[in-house]
A protein has these predicted regions:
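Glycine-rich phosphate-binding loops of nucleotide-dependent enzymes
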Residues: 1-263
Length: 263
């Protein structure tokens, strides 16, 4: 999506820090080259939003799966804070400080028939704050969930209700609460405002910019070029499984890169 109009986000100037995420010559072979990555490298730094712009189906899913630990690279390496993540898994990536806002919030972001409170702690079940020798502290979990719902303005039938009963915007705010409360070093934001109304979209963007200000590295994957231009410090275009640096913020030139027709 190249048009559409995104309200300008207040993106303050930040000095980029050290590299948080490094991909070095990684490859994943999918069903076609549009589902793959071919010896690609990138670096995302603290206090920075790295935007990945592209038309749907050009390797975004492969890139997101790699960083989430859902795929193991066939070659190359993944580093978080300079340390190689061997045979990445979702648990390893979370442990390394990666927070994930998935593309499909309803199927990848929540367990629909699980209540909201339990969805909020699903990624930290080893934390002794919420469990003791494997027994969950339900009172603590519900109190924490109520506090997070107030902080992130999650509205709906309550923390004991199944997550699937909440609206899309409130599910996304619940996911934001789960991610940001862990103070991740790296945030994978994959189509974070897709399908949201203007108010919910603005809130998501504000939270991403706050995380950037506070030192996180953010990898923003979006098909909305307006969003990428508004939020990103640097932009890479993904096309046919290849990452191409955008040397300009000119919409027309980036659009040509997205279409694979740039000179």
């Amino acid at each position: 999506m190249v048009g559409g109009g995104v309200k300008s986000a207040e993106r303050e100037t930040c000095m980029p820090g050290e590299a948080v995420l490094q991909l070095n010559q990684v490859s994943i072979t999918g069903r076609s080259k549009r589902d793959s990555l071919f010896e690609q490298s990138l670096e995302a730094r603290a206090h920075e939003i790295l935007g990945i712009a592209g038309v749907s189906g050009n390797g975004q899913a492969a890139l997101a799966s790699l960083i989430a630990g859902l795929e193991v690279p066939e070659n190359g390496s993944i580093l978080i804070d300079g340390s190689t993540v061997e045979k990445p898994t979702p648990k390893k990536m979370i442990g390394a400080g990666v927070g994930r806002i998935p593309e499909d919030r309803n199927h990848e972001g929540i367990i629909g028939k699980m209540n909201l409170a339990d969805n909020l702690i699903i990624e930290k079940l080893d934390d002794t704050e919420i469990q003791n020798f494997g027994i969950l502290k339900q009172g603590k979990i519900k109190t924490s969930a109520a506090d997070l719902c107030a902080t992130y303005d999650v509205r709906g039938p309550g923390v004991d209700a199944e997550a699937r009963l909440f609206s899309g915007g409130n599910i996304q705010k619940m996911i934001l609460a789960r991610v940001f409360e862990q103070n991740p070093k790296l945030i994978l934001a994959n189509q974070p405002t897709r399908g949201l109304d203007m108010g919910a979209s603005a809130e998501v963007r504000r939270r991403l910019l706050d995380a950037r200000k506070n030192g996180a590295a953010i990898l923003l994957i979006s098909e909305d070029l307006d969003e990428v231009l508004a939020l990103s410090d640097r932009i890479l275009v993904i096309h046919d499984g290849n990452l191409i640096p955008a040397e300009t913020r000119d919409r027309a030139q980036i659009g040509l890169l997205m279409a694979g027709t740039a000179a």
